[in-house]
Amino acid sequence: MRIIDNKAIELKTKYPDRITTIIPNSRLVDWDGRVGTVLVHWTMDTVRVLHNLGFTKVPSTIRKDYTWPGIYTPFDHQRATSEFLVANKRAYVFNEQGTGKTSAAAWAIDYLMTKHIVRRALIICPLSIMKSAWQNDLFKTVMHRPVGIAHGSTEQRKKVIESDVDIVIINFDGIEIVLDTLIKSDFNLVVIDEATAIKRDTTDRWKAVNQLVKPDTWLWQMTGTPAAQSPVDAYGLVKLMHPEKVDRTAYQFKDRVMYKVSTFTWKPKREANEYIHRLMQPAIRFTKEECLDLPEILYQTREVPLTKQQQKYYDTLAKEMLITLSDESITSVNAAVNMNKLLQVASGAVYTDTGEVIDFDSKTRFEELVNIIEESSHSVLVFCAFKHTIATLEAKLTKKNYIVDSVHGGVSLNKRSDIFKRFQESGQKQILLIQPQSASHGVTLHAANTIVWWSPTTSYETYAQANARVHRAGQKNPCTVVNIEGCGVEKKLYRALQERESNQFDLLGLYKDILNG
């Protein structure tokens, strides 16, 4: 195959009639008795037809007539992903976490809008990445496109949807709230990020999304782990994308891809993965190992609001601290103690002056942690400052059948050594929960390529050294550091850490800044 004058594609095939009878702007230019040479006018429509005929390597027209706007140049794998999306009205993107698939989708959306193929786009994603991933990436890539975030009250959501912005971002649980408004709007492209959130077709969430997808709707589903726990996880995704491809019910589908071992135990059939692979097409996937042009370490922010219980206690504490702020005798030590209390609330448990522990509902943060773990193809390190929270997380993750270990100040040196050795050498995907100070120096843990900060530290040295446990000699994959934040003190600290200021900043000044908003 070759491109001629940026206008036509030359293809060699044993069956030229398959092309010339379907594509009007094509002609047979040579036939040697076995193989024909066909010239095809290079347009978006002909590319899609050729892909459907099996010529999947035919490049998208985005390659010849798009300027790739934005503040940075796309990586090769991002260009390939954008090309793929533009060429496929219904498609899956299975690129691994940290490979920049949101930017690739943004460019594809913009290109289709410039061609007047897509009128408006609806991005459906978790609340935690509405701003930190989608809004930020859209601003960096297609800043000329008006973007609105449909979040807040029902009226606020409706106002954004009914406005004239090109791209609307909404979280999964917000869809049902304004479903009628969304249905009446003219979205003809729907992008579902972290699509495993709609893997069950019996949920209200799936049913709401399904009402937005019409036969002529462009639909792109994005996830790094399409069937992480079970082949059945693919059912809801495929039914939304191509309902004709799957059984009528999830139970029938389960029977097709799994077999029953005992009353409560099912196992995948030998051919299940191959069957799922055939169903979930067309698809594209890049792992971080394949993306040779990626930076060695990537930073992400996941915004996870505090639960109502946490927010109430956090606000009460902050108000009390604000009252004492006028006291000139307050010191950096007092500030550090108070700031630590706020961090404890956000983390899920507060230590009282008598040593007791008050637990808080931190369900949303835990769900986000599970999402991140599911997205990662390798083991994961989770840094958490508080011992009680580590114990809570270990119990919850173990209950979800993850292989989990923990290291904190109460773990002996010999036991730590055994845990680190097992983590490095087992070859299994594991979760290691660590107090940052317990493994911030001299330990190699590059069996992981994802680090999660459940809550921030106040020391840049600790932050940098802890991240270096994964990003060090011997690491063969690009690494991702995910900062989870849900309150003012966390946002301020992460910003200071990323600006490498926390070893020098005025702790008292930062504390005052946090309380004053």
Indicate residue ranges for each PLM-predicted region.
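SF2 helicase motor core recognition
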Residues: 175-180, 229-231, 390-394, 416-420, ...
